[in-house]
Amino acid sequence: MKIVACNSNRPLAEAVAAALNLPLTKASVRRFADMEVFVEIHENVRGEDVFVIQSTSYPANDNLMELLITLDALRRGSARRVTAVIPYFGYARQDRKSGPRTPISAKLVANLITEAGANRVLTMDLHAGQIQGFFDIPVDNLYAAPLFARDIAERFHGRDIMIVSPDVGGVLRARAIATRLNTDLAIIDKRRERAGVSEVMNVIGDVEGRDCILIDDICDSGGTLCNAAAALIANGAASASVYTTHGVLSGGAVARIASSPISMMTITDSILATEAVRLAQNVRQLTIAPLLAEAMRRISDESSVSSLFD
């Protein structure tokens, strides 16, 4: 097995390599004066089982091109199999037509990754599970649920907790954690009664006096989760915390979270933390490196990945 790290999240790639007791394959990603990307693999990969680690997070287009060009370099270098390890799959929120004459960008990205030379994909908490069907190659979608459930059990031991989905679409994700913890599930139903009227958040479930934990896959601007936390507190919750897999946290998200009722937001290191995230008092990271490493080992050994979540 060989591991190639692109530039979007090198610390995560190094942690994965360390967990597998393997060195990173020597490779370089450079940019010409006009910002074209040039990738060079400095070791022989002929006949090797190669894993390329690259999140397609901000800047999404640059990181996507790095991944595509690296895949092409490995394919042309006669690697036996190339797995694109994409902890955060950018463009996943564009998984359907949002209106007339609009693209399905997630499908386009899937096509590009396949055509560039990937033989399989390993990713984490896809925004929409059906994206796996956009690929004509195998896709292993890992879940943060076991990691989050263990952390919640440790941090909230002995407290009266309730798992909360911030919207109807996230119920299955939240229920998976509630089931692991044998606790109750609440749902926030967002409704706009008529045009021009502010969105109303209705809490379905009795959260009075309970420590509520919101579960989501992506936190971008933070607006939805901050509003959801405020709704929980307004309905009598003792506290509101958040667990979300992918901390995109764009723009003023960190400042928005800091001034919100969210007592603590827990994210994973699927996306490289910005300085604002590292300095934030109420944002913390859990590493997914051991989970990725074990999944990669199983793929290389041709053993079951799904049994990680049994």
Curated annotation (Swiss-Prot):
GO terms for molecular function: ATP binding; kinase activity; magnesium ion binding; ribose phosphate diphosphokinase activity. GO terms for cellular component: cytoplasm; ribose phosphate diphosphokinase complex. Pfam families: Pribosyl_synth, Pribosyltran_N. Pathway: Metabolic intermediate biosynthesis; 5-phospho-alpha-D-ribose 1-diphosphate biosynthesis; 5-phospho-alpha-D-ribose 1-diphosphate from D-ribose 5-phosphate (route I): step 1/1. D-ribose 5-phosphate binds at residues 192, 216, 220-224. It is an enzyme of class 2 (transferase). The active site is at 190. NCBIfam families: PRK01259.1, ribP_PPkin. Homohexamer. GO terms for biological process: 5-phosphoribose 1-diphosphate biosynthetic process; purine nucleotide biosynthetic process; ribonucleoside monophosphate biosynthetic process. It is found in: Cytoplasm. Keywords: ATP-binding, Cytoplasm, Kinase, Magnesium, Metal-binding, Nucleotide biosynthesis, Nucleotide-binding, Transferase. InterPro entries: PRib_PP_synth_CS (IPR000842), Pribosyltran_N (IPR029099), PRibTrfase_dom (IPR000836), PRTase-like (IPR029057), Rib-P_diPkinase (IPR005946), Rib-P_diPkinase_bac (IPR037515). SMART domains: Pribosyltran_N (SM01400). Mg(2+) 1 binds at residue 127. Binds 2 Mg(2+) ions per subunit. Involved in the biosynthesis of the central metabolite phospho-alpha-D-ribosyl-1-pyrophosphate (PRPP) via the transfer of pyrophosphoryl group from ATP to 1-hydroxyl of ribose-5-phosphate (Rib-5-P). Mg(2+) 2 binds at residue 167. Belongs to the ribose-phosphate pyrophosphokinase family. Class I subfamily. It comes from Granulibacter bethesdensis (strain ATCC BAA-1260 / CGDNIH1). Its cofactor is Mg(2+). This is Ribose-phosphate pyrophosphokinase. ATP binds at residues 34-36, 93-94. Its EC number is 2.7.6.1. It catalyses: D-ribose 5-phosphate + ATP = 5-phospho-alpha-D-ribose 1-diphosphate + AMP + H(+). Coiled coil: none annotated.
